[in-house]
C-alpha cells in the first residue's frame, strides 16, 4: 500500500447527491472535510492545498470542482454518503451509513458500514472482478470510526479517539508557552503559530494576516458584508454559525457552564474560562505597549485599540467614527431608537445587553464589586473603578486648553465641551439644545414629569438616579470625604472639591462678558443670566418667569399658601427661607438691646 494522500480521505458528491442533503448536512460535510484536511497538514502529509479545500473555504459547492482537479489518477478511496439509499434517515443516521469504494486497476470493492458498527472490521467487504465471483474479505486498509454523537470520517492515521475526546471535554494537548489546553493536537499546532508569529494567510483587501485559512475566510465577510446565518427568533442576521449559536442563548437564557468556586452560571465555555481567572488572579494576556495584563484575549484585543487613533468604523447617519464594529452597531441604535434588551421586572429597555445585566442587579440587590479600601460595594466594575479614584489624589487627565486636571478621562471629555459653543443634542419637545446627550436625557424628564427613582427610607422620588444616591447620604451621618488641609469632613466628594478652593483662593470660572471670576461653575452659570436677561423658568399657574429654578420653586409656594419656614423664637411662619432669616434679625436686635440696657444698669 502506498503513502496516504488527501485523495484517500476525499468525500465526493454528484450534483444530484448534493441536492439530496439539507443545509445542516452540507455544513457538516464541509466541517468534516476541512478538519480531515487539517489533520493531514498536521501530520505533514499534505504539502499543497487541494482545489476542493479552497472551494470549501470560499463557500462554494464541492461538485463544481472538476474531478481531475480534486482527485488524481492514482488509486483512490472515496466516501459516499448513502443518501439515495436511505432518504428517510435523519442527519445522524445519514452519517452512520457510509459506502467506501476502492478503485484499483480492474477491481473495486464495496464496503457498507451498518448502523451500530464500531468500525469497518465489523462490516464486510465484497470484492468482485469481471468474472462475477464474490468473495468476502475483512477490511484492514482503512477504518471508519463511529461516535455516539455522530459519525466522523477519519483515517487510521488520524486517531479515532480525537472526536470522542471532544465529547468528554478532556483537553490532553497543552501549550508549553502559555499553558492553554486543547482537545486536538491539530488545534494545538495551529495555536502555536500565535507564539511563533507564523502567518500563512493574507487578506488581499486590507493586507491583514492570519495563521489560519478559516480565520481569513471569516475575515473576508467583513469586506463583503455577507451574513449567512439568520436567527429564527428575532430575524437578526449574523456572519458566523458560531455567533448564531451563541446569540440563540440570549433568547433561551440557557447557561450551560457553572463556576465551581462561586456557583455563577455562564452561557459560554470561553466566558467560564476567563471568569475562573478572577478567582485565581491569573492574567495571562499582557499588552506589549503598556504592560497591562488581562484575563482574556478578547479584552486585550479591545484594550490594544486604545493605543491607536485609527477609527475604521464610520456611522453613515452622522459620520461619527469608532474603533470597534461592535461599538458602531450599538451606536446605530441611537438613530433607530432600537432597545432590544428589556428588563422583565420593570419593563425598562436598553440598547446594550451589558447595561441590562447591570440594571437587573438593582432589583436583586446584588453588588459583586467591592472596594478593598472602604468596603463599599457596587453593581458594576465601572462604578467600582470610578469610586476607587476618589481614594486617590492623582489627576492624570489634563485639559490642553486651560490646564485643568481631572481624575477621570470621562470628566475631561465632558469638561472639553465647556470650551466649545457647539450643542448638538436638541430636545424635540421644546427645541432646547444641549452639549451632552446625558443632559438631554435628564431634561426630557421635565416634560414627562416622571420620577422613577424612589428613596426606600422616606419615600421621596427623584428624576435622576444620581440625585437619589446623593439624597440617601442625608439619612446617614457618615462623612467619608475629609479635607487634608483643615480636617473638615463632608458627605459628598463634590462638596469637598468646592471646599478645597477656599484654601487655594482660586477662582477658576471666569465670565467672558465682565471678567468676574467664581469658585464654582454653577455660580458662573447663574451669573451669566444677568447678561442675557433670559428667564427660562416659568410658573404654570400665573405665567411669571424667573432667571433661576430656585426662584421659581420659592414663587410656587405663594400659590399654595404653604409656609414651611417657621421661627423657633416666636413661632411665626414664612413662605421663603430668606424672609425667615430677615425676621430672625428682629430677635437678634431685641437681645442686643436688652444686653446693652443691662450693661448700663
UniProtKB/Swiss-Prot annotation:
One example GO MF annotation: zinc ion binding
Classification via CDD domains: KRAB_A-box
Keyword presence, NADP: no
GO cellular component, one term: nucleus
Zinc finger (C2H2-type): 173-195, 201-223, 229-251, 257-279, 285-307, 313-335, 341-363, 369-391, 397-419, 425-447, 453-475, 481-503, 509-531, 537-559, 565-587
Subcellular location: Nucleus
Domain named KRAB: residues: 4-75
UniProt superkingdom: Eukaryota
Location, primary (coarse class): nucleus
Keywords, ordered alphabetically: DNA-binding, Metal-binding, Nucleus, Repeat, Transcription, Transcription regulation, Zinc, Zinc-finger
Cross-referenced PROSITE patterns: KRAB (PS50805), ZINC_FINGER_C2H2_1 (PS00028), ZINC_FINGER_C2H2_2 (PS50157)
InterPro entries attached to this UniProt entry: KRAB (IPR001909), KRAB_dom_sf (IPR036051), Znf_C2H2_sf (IPR036236), Znf_C2H2_type (IPR013087)
Ranges annotated as spanning the membrane: none
Keyword Mitochondrion: no
One Pfam family of this chain: zf-C2H2
GO biological process: regulation of DNA-templated transcription
Coiled-coil segments on the chain, per record: none
PANTHER family, per the entry: TRANSCRIPTIONAL REPRESSOR PROTEIN YY, ZINC FINGER PROTEIN 143
Family: Belongs to the krueppel C2H2-type zinc-finger protein family.
Free-text function comment from the UniProt entry: May be involved in transcriptional regulation.
Record-given protein name: Zinc finger protein 90
Species this protein is from: Homo sapiens
Gene name as annotated: ZNF90
Amino acid at each position: 500500500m502506498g503513502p496516504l494522500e488527501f485523495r484517500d480521505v476525499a468525500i465526493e458528491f454528484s450534483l444530484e447527491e448534493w441536492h439530496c442533503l439539507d443545509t445542516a448536512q452540507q455544513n457538516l460535510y464541509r466541517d468534516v472535510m476541512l478538519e480531515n484536511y487539517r489533520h493531514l497538514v498536521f501530520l505533514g502529509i499534505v504539502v499543497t492545498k487541494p482545489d476542493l479545500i479552497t472551494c470549501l473555504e470560499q463557500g462554494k459547492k464541492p461538485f463544481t470542482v472538476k474531478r481531475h482537479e480534486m482527485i488524481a489518477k492514482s488509486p483512490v478511496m472515496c466516501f459516499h454518503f448513502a443518501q439515495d439509499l436511505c432518504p428517510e434517515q435523519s442527519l445522524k443516521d445519514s452519517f452512520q451509513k457510509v459506502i467506501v469504494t476502492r478503485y484499483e486497476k480492474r477491481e473495486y470493492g464495496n464496503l457498507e458500514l451498518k448502523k451500530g458498527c464500531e468500525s469497518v472490521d465489523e462490516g464486510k467487504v465484497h470484492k468482485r472482478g469481471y468474472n462475477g465471483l464474490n468473495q468476502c474479505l475483512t477490511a484492514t486498509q482503512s477504518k471508519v470510526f463511529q461516535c455516539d454523537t455522530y459519525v466522523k470520517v477519519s483515517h487510521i492515521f488520524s486517531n479515532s479517539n480525537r472526536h470522542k475526546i471532544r465529547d468528554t471535554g478532556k483537553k490532553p494537548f497543552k501549550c508549553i508557552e502559555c499553558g492553554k489546553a486543547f482537545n486536538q493536537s491539530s488545534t494545538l499546532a495551529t495555536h502555536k503559530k500565535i507564539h511563533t508569529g507564523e502567518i500563512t494567510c493574507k487578506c488581499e483587501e486590507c493586507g491583514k494576516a492570519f495563521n489560519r485559512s478559516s480565520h481569513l475566510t471569516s475575515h473576508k465577510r467583513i469586506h463583503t458584508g455577507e451574513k449567512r446565518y439568520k436567527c429564527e427568533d428575532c430575524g437578526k442576521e449574523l456572519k458566523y454559525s458560531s455567533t448564531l449559536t451563541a446569540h440563540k442563548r440570549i433568547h433561551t437564557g440557557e447557561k450551560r457552564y457553572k463556576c465551581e468556586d462561586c456557583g455563577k452560571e455562564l452561557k459560554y465555555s470561553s466566558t467560564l474560562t476567563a471568569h475562573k481567572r478572577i478567582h485565581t488572579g491569573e492574567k495571562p494576556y499582557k499588552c506589549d505597549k503598556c504592560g497591562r495584563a488581562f484575563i482574556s484575549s478578547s479584552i486585550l484585543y479591545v484594550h490594544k485599540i486604545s493605543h491607536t487613533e485609527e477609527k475604521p468604523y464610520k456611522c453613515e447617519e452622522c459620520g461619527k467614527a469608532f474603533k470597534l464594529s461592535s461599538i458602531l452597531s450599538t451606536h446605530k441604535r441611537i438613530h433607530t431608537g432600537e432597545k432590544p434588551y428589556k428588563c422583565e421586572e420593570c419593563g425598562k429597555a436598553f440598547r446594550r445587553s451589558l447595561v441590562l445585566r447591570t440594571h437587573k442587579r438593582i432589583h436583586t440587590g446584588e453588588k459583586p464589586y467591592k472596594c478593598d479600601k472602604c468596603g463599599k460595594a457596587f453593581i458594576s466594575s465601572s462604578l467600582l473603578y470610578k469610586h476607587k479614584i476618589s481614594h486617590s489624589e492623582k489627576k492624570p487627565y489634563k485639559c490642553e486648553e486651560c490646564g485643568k486636571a481631572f481624575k477621570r478621562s470621562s470628566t475631561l471629555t465632558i469638561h472639553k465641551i465647556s470650551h466649545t459653543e457647539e450643542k448638538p443634542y436638541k430636545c424635540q419637545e421644546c427645541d432646547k439644545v444641549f452639549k451632552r446627550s446625558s443632559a438631554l436625557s435628564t431634561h426630557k424628564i421635565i416634560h414627562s414629569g416622571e420620577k422613577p427613582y424612589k428613596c426606600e427610607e422616606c419615600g421621596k422620588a427623584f428624576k435622576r438616579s444620581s440625585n437619589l444616591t446623593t439624597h440617601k447620604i442625608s439619612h446617614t451621618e457618615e462623612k467619608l470625604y475629609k479635607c487634608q488641609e483643615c480636617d473638615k469632613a463632608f458627605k459628598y466628594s463634590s462638596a469637598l472639591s468646592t471646599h478645597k478652593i477656599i484654601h487655594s483662593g482660586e477662582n477658576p470660572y471666569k465670565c467672558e462678558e465682565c471678567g468676574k471670576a467664581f469658585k464654582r461653575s454653577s455660580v458662573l452659570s447663574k451669573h451669566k443670566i444677568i447678561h442675557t436677561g433670559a428667564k427660562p423658568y416659568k410658573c404654570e399657574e400665573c405665567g411669571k418667569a424667573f432667571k433661576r429654578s430656585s426662584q421659581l420653586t420659592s414663587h410656587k409656594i405663594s400659590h399654595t399658601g404653604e409656609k414651611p419656614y417657621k421661627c423657633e423664637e416666636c413661632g411665626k411662619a414664612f413662605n421663603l427661607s430668606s424672609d425667615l432669616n430677615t425676621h430672625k434679625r428682629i430677635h437678634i436686635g431685641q437681645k442686643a438691646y436688652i444686653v446693652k440696657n443691662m450693661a448700663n444698669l
